[in-house]
Amino acid sequence: FVDAEGYTHAPASESLFGSALPRPAGKIDTQTSYIVPLYFGLFNEKNKQLAIEHLKEAIARSHNTLTTGFIGTPYLNLVLSENGYDELAYTLFEQTEYPSWLYPVLQGATTMWERWNSYTIINGFGPVGMNSFNHYAYGAIQEWMFAYSIGIQRDEKQPGYKHILLQPRIGGSFTYIKGHYDTVYGRVESSWNKSDKEYTYQATIPANTTATLYLPVTDPSKVIEN
């Protein structure tokens, strides 16, 4: 009963939250403070655009590095790509300065760490009280990698990958991306190549499934199907 009563107030709470203006710079102006409500669709359309701009400014202030923790990191690149900022998402993904996904790799990481600096070549190991070297949280970036970089997404209206959304976002310094996902119906494969003259995209879906393909082009007449 308590849960049911709480849910009845959810739309009103969402409306109240969404109509509140995002705070100006310097007042609770963190990356996560914008990422989470943007991901869950809590802002109205006017304030959504303001929140996106505030988020971009917050990222710029940190010199295109992450200031998010376990709550904001999983949604950061998803929010950027869902709102058309794929290049910024790729910039964060390829960042090597601290704190970033690739910074630990340059320090010798072969797993996901609990901290961005669990170990550094210069300073050695971080505090033992919070320093797991096998910690999933920051590895949540793989959802963005599958959904937008590789371009394989589930259709929530047809669960189980009966219908598949293929939506590759070509960007960053990459010239080639390939990946697959094994569904209950079989393997979905998606890959793209980028050259100076053209983009090439290939996909394979299992038998007895369908897919909708979204390509990042502005002129459909330039799309050639093979």
Predicted regions and their residues:
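Catalytic cores of carbohydrate-active enzymes
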Residues: 1-125
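Non-catalytic C-terminal accessory modules of carbohydrate-active enzymes
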Residues: 87-226
